[in-house]
């Protein structure tokens, strides 16, 4: 274009022949397909990002996590995961409505963006669950340092529709390869640690260890036993 922009064009070439079937010339038609390309790019973005916050979604995050683990395995370095779950978000959603809840999630995403490093991946897994992937030889110390910053940042209110909302968060931390050698295990164990942070009083962070999984398994078995006892007794 005259202003230096490059436009994607679709070229269609047709043959023109005379009455004897002899090719005499060609006709080329150029069509601007910028809008089509923009639509395709937008659809691709929406397939891999959360519509509300525009953060990477679970699909894109899982793909990145797999690749980062493969690279960490080859190069022999560590990575860390922070599994972040908002405390009492459902209360706000139920009392003030989903519109306020959605806007709060947008504000939370923006605050988290301001805290993570450029090399980190921040994603929304769904609902009020966020996760941070820390690369480049991340350790428990660096992960705990970021978790402390997140918890401290959530001490400040979130302004939504003229209302100051206070909400905390519980964070579970895992480090590869010590706390999981694959993406599924690493994320599952971070989730387990997050729930322990909630059990410990919320508004804090917990590092995963094997005892947490055993405690979680025992709790599930106890819940099943209690449900069975109630069912059989009824």
What is each residue range found by the language model?
Residues 11-13, 30, 168:
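Sensory-domain boundary capping and coupling elements
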Residues 1-4, 17-18, 22-32:
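PAS-family sensory domains
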Residues 122, 149, 153, 159, ...:
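Cyclic nucleotide signaling catalytic output domains
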Residues 37, 41-48, 54-81, 87-117, ...:
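Conserved long alpha-helical elements within nucleotide-processing catalytic cores of c-di-GMP signaling
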